[in-house]
């Protein structure tokens, strides 16, 4: 189902809310929602650190929730909104779930499986191709990632300072 720009913006803002959940837990802040007939049927945010599971990416969580909602592994007639270009693993899962439409915010230059490094969702050698739109609220999506990495650098500085204080009692 095609969505208006206003509707797309709303759904990407919902994905950003999911990303914020990850940011609050010091997880890489990526958020995702899956929409069918104008209704969010799956939500997810990165939870690898919290779960100690490498596959707990936002897209994987949203796909699992949408599968449960639909009672089907095929997510036909859905649109996946995600703040950052899906990685290779998530791109494969999107294809396997038969999601026909993906809209992402910012590109993923290090791990992108849609455009940046690989083109899994549009590869003609595969049996399922996905319509992809990119750049929706890209600045907002990139900004939350920049906030995460800035906070990480600040945490490292504080940790180094505390270690130095503990090791040098005469400072």
Curated annotation (Swiss-Prot):
Its EC number is 3.5.4.33. It comes from the Bacteria. SUPFAM superfamilies: Cytidine deaminase-like (SSF53927). It catalyses: adenosine(34) in tRNA + H2O + H(+) = inosine(34) in tRNA + NH4(+). The active site is at residue 59. Binds 1 zinc ion per subunit. The keyword Membrane does not apply. One of its GO terms (molecular function) is tRNA-specific adenosine-34 deaminase activity. CDD domains: nucleoside_deaminase. It holds the Pfam family MafB19-deam. Its cofactor is Zn(2+). HAMAP family: tRNA_aden_deaminase. Belongs to the cytidine and deoxycytidylate deaminase family. Catalyzes the deamination of adenosine to inosine at the wobble position 34 of tRNA(Arg2). This is tRNA-specific adenosine deaminase. It comes from Streptococcus pyogenes serotype M1.
């Amino acid at each position: 189902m095609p969505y208006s720009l206003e509707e797309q913006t709303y759904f990407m803002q919902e994905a950003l809310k999911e990303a914020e959940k990850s940011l609050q837990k010091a997880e890489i802040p990526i958020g995702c929602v899956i929409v069918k007939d104008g209704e969010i049927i799956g939500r997810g945010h990165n939870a690898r650190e919290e779960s100690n599971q490498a596959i707990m990416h936002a897209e994987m969580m949203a796909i699992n929730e949408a599968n449960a909602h639909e009672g089907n592994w095929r997510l036909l007639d859905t649109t996946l909104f995600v703040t950052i270009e899906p990685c290779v693993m998530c791109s494969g899962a999107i294809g396997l779930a038969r999601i026909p439409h993906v809209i992402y915010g910012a590109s993923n230059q290090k791990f992108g499986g849609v455009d940046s490094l690989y083109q899994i969702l549009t590869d003609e050698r595969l049996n399922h191709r996905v319509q992809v739109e990119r750049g929706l609220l890209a600045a907002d999506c990139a900004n939350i990632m920049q906030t995460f990495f800035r906070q990480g650098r600040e945490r490292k500085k504080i940790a180094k300072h505390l270690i130095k204080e503990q090791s040098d009692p005469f400072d």
